[in-house]
Amino acid sequence: MLEEPGLITFAQTKIQPPRLRSGLIVRAALERNLHGALASRRLTVLQAPAGWGKTSALTRVLSQLPTGHAYVWIAADEDDDLQRFLACLSAALEPLDLAWRIAPRALPTLALAERGLRQVADEVANALASSEIERGTLVIDDAHRVKDPRVFELLRLLLESLPAPHWGLALSTRTVPDLPLARWRALDEVAELRLEDLRFDEQDVAALLAANGVAPDIASELARRTDGWAAGLRLLMSVGGGMGHGRSAAPGQRHVFEYLADEVLSAVDAELRDFLLRCSILPELTPRRCAYVAQQPRAGLLLERIEREGLFVVLLDAEERTLRLHDLFRDFLEDRLQRDHADELPGLLRRAAEHEPDLARAVGWLARAGAWEEAAQAMAERGPALVPLGGGPT
């Protein structure tokens, strides 16, 4: 049942950007690109998994906008249906003192009429066009939380109606939004910032450490260990930069594991979760290898989904679709695999070793599986051929 528009209530924090976090650093390239996108594009999309600093980047850049650039903020929630979203939107726009043709509080009711979404989009666009604002941005934070498809249909219609070049839309999201991005890319009307743009490099990590009173001598190792993941950096820094090179979780990494469990693994369905766990022993993921090791005939489709949803992976080879799991995520998955499916681990390791061209890696997996005879046989059969090349294990 839809809520009566007059009864829709929400916390004011939904339409207020979060306060800037202390210890943030200047990230010139990222901020320059985001500034440029917000100033000129019809749509700006920040897409990356949990904890990559999407909201922090947005709030920092919004705080630096010139006087003539206005913005409104909506933090999306799972229970935001169309009526609730429109109530938030009208409340967020209220401080701009727009010239509405209808009362903005009537938007949720108008949306229920025939062709209501088109009418709502036109009313909002006309109200925005009536303002003397030089440039404005509608910001939807955590857009992936919205489950009502009508909200994205409204956003599509609104994007087509926004008064250009004065207004644009910005989304932060963990998944690809349900919008016609391909068409807008062709028209050069969308700017997309992804994981690669948000990743902290070694210089960023050193600056972050210095800003938080931590010696920068561990910057290189932290950058490598976290792969530039903002949340991982914060969590490891909070416990003194614990690195934990062993297979068991160091105290600092336990915080990372808990975060991953809550924010990532619990959000995917059982099929994808089991696939990730069973493939976590592999340093590189390909459809053929994952299908064999995990005994999952849908491996190719699942890998496409993992890449599409940005689940802490890096694309190594587009032609063969070879992915690499983020180190911390892989550590977490292996830890969970050992805890919840220890009985399956020997079989997974044996299958992984069976077609592994790297002898040292194959022998290591067989040793972990307790398959000592098979490990010795692999050494006897393949080891001598590698000695002249200096490739044998030591």
State each model region's role:
Residues 2-50, 56, 60-61:
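Walker A/P-loop-proximal flanking segment of P-loop NTPase domains
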Residues 52, 56-135, 145-147:
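Conserved phosphate-binding/catalytic loops and adjacent sensor/switch elements of nucleotide-binding enzymes
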Residues 1, 44-52, 58-62, 157-160, ...:
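C-terminal boundary/linker of central alpha/beta nucleotide-binding cores
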Residues 62, 86, 90, 94, ...:
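Short, amphipathic alpha-helical segments that act as regulatory/interfacial helices
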Residues 141-142:
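Walker B catalytic acidic pair
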Residues 342-394:
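Extended alpha-helical scaffolding segments used for macromolecular assembly and cargo binding
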Residues 208-210, 220-225, 231-244, 274-278, ...:
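C-terminal helical "lid" of AAA+/P-loop NTPase domains
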Residues 6-9, 13-14, 26-30, 56-60, ...:
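Alpha-helical sensor/transducer elements of the RecA-like P-loop NTPase core
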